[in-house]
Amino acid sequence: MAFKDWMNNLRDYFVEDDEEFNEPTRPVQESRPTVASTPKPKVEERKVQADYQSRRPAQTTPKPQTQTAAPKRSASTFSKPMPEKIVQQQTVSQAQSLAATVSTIAIKEPRAYADIMESARIVKNGECVLVNFKFMGDAQARRSIDFMTGVVFTLDGDIQNVGGQIFLMTPANITVDAAKEMSILAGQNFESYDIY
């Protein structure tokens, strides 16, 4: 009997350990995504530092003779070029934003309703369109204006009657202040034109 009791106790010993062993595996699986996400920023930092080091020899700046002792510098002095890079990135991004602010205005004079699709594509691509309906009949022009109003509405843009049969369609990122237009035109004595 002693042997049988010993075997049962031995079996119970391993069964209890198996149940306890299965519980810690769940938190280990949950912690894996956090471990995988932390190395990514380190890789990006290395790329930025490598990118900066590859650009540094290309820069030619006059250096005083007191700076020729570069090997004697401590590790803390190497962090100073990083703000220069940040400043360079800011100036590049400012130049890109200035280039992005330059926009073109396409001028279209459709002769049929089918020609309006081209104007809609231009507005969809983020440019302004000035549409003159002088070569189109009244019924087709109204139908075209209804279509253009729908296009501009879906793109969160704007459509304005500039004068008579001329309409300006603008995408969402461009706004036109009609009050400024009116003051400019009034100052130049263009009272005879229909401006709404």
From Swiss-Prot:
GO terms for biological process: division septum assembly; FtsZ-dependent cytokinesis. It is found in: Cytoplasm. Keywords: Cell cycle, Cell division, Cytoplasm, Septation. Its main location: cytoplasm. Residues 57-72 have a biased composition (Low complexity). Residues 15-80 are annotated as: Disordered. GO terms for cellular component: cytoplasm. InterPro entries: Cell_div_SepF, Cell_div_SepF/SepF-rel, SepF-like_sf. The keyword Ribosomal protein does not apply. Homodimer. Interacts with FtsZ. Cell division protein that is part of the divisome complex and is recruited early to the Z-ring. Probably stimulates Z-ring formation, perhaps through the cross-linking of FtsZ protofilaments. Its function overlaps with FtsA. HAMAP family: SepF. Belongs to the SepF family. This is Cell division protein SepF. It comes from Lactococcus lactis subsp. cremoris (strain MG1363).
